[in-house]
Amino acid sequence: MKIKQAIDKIPGGLMLVPLFLGALCNTFTPGAGKYLGSFSNGLITGTIPILAVWFFCMGASIELKATGTMLKKSGVLVITKLATAWVVALIAGTFLPGDGIQNGLLAGISVLALVAAMDMTNGGLYAALMNQYGSKEEAGAFVLMSLESGPLMTMVILGASGIATFEPQLFVGAVLPFLIGFTLGNLDPDLRKLFGNSVQTLIPFFAFALGNTINLAVILQTGFAGIFLGVLVIVVTGIPLIIADKFIGGGNGTAGVAASSSAGAAVATPLLIANMAPEFAPVAQQATALVATSVIVTSVLVPVITALWAKRFSPKHA
């Protein structure tokens, strides 16, 4: 059976299929983890420890070697994406209630959902698109985008916008596994290869555990809002990214369009933030479902828009 091949045909499938299976388990057999106990309970409820290992391996996979062009391009895109998410947090924090929108088609939209969906780029999607429509240096910019992975930047944005307060040690705890992995990976190429190969492997495991925190009813309730959020991510982050790429990064805007997506890893952010800041716990489940939908929407639309943009503005693809 070509199970992996079938999963790969679904945008973000490696993350979203196990997430959906976990949500199925949580909806119809919510006590399975406690009932089975032992290793099965660990797989079902182990989101945080599995993610900790994943962040460590992600850090180990990043090589501290890049050209000036690559650093300039990636720096411009990453800073623009984070700055945009911060502005959105400031605006949303002013107008949205603390527990998010409760009624209507946009029920579930909260500051946490908006920031989590917007502050992290799908690096793999970006690299694939820029390999096709850009230069090798532009494609290589995804390396710095890996620094967005995890809850750290979301914590910084929520803290800087005055929406949440985090104890200093929580910032250290959020980034420490990543930094240890990064250090070891750059000290020894063999360790980088060993741990770096585990990044993709661990995704289905933390996705399944994460899915076990979601009820399918929540996914159905937030369907339209999730689609809206995905489109909003492309428009709200895409426009500043295009402008920054053209006028600061020296590109033609294609890289900006390619970076206007939600990363699969962002699906885990609401739960991680709620684990450190309990005031977000009431909106975490809905935010997780919304971000998951946003990942699908941006994974489908961003490649299409990037291709159209490159055809219109890139000489070699005109």
Swiss-Prot record:
| InterPro entries in alphabetical order | 2keto-3dGluconate_permease, 2keto-3dGluconate_permease_sub
Role played: Catalyzes the proton-dependent uptake of 2-keto-3-deoxygluconate (KDG) into the cell.
Q: Where in the cell is it found?
A: Cell inner membrane
**Entry membrane topology:** Multi-pass membrane protein
Provide this UniProt record's keywords sorted from A to Z. Cell inner membrane, Cell membrane, Membrane, Sugar transport, Symport, Transmembrane, Transmembrane helix, Transport
Originating organism:
Pectobacterium carotovorum subsp. carotovorum (strain PC1)
| Protein's UniProt name | 2-keto-3-deoxygluconate permease
* Catalytic activity of the protein: 2-dehydro-3-deoxy-D-gluconate(in) + H(+)(in) = 2-dehydro-3-deoxy-D-gluconate(out) + H(+)(out)
Q: Has keyword Lipoprotein? A: no
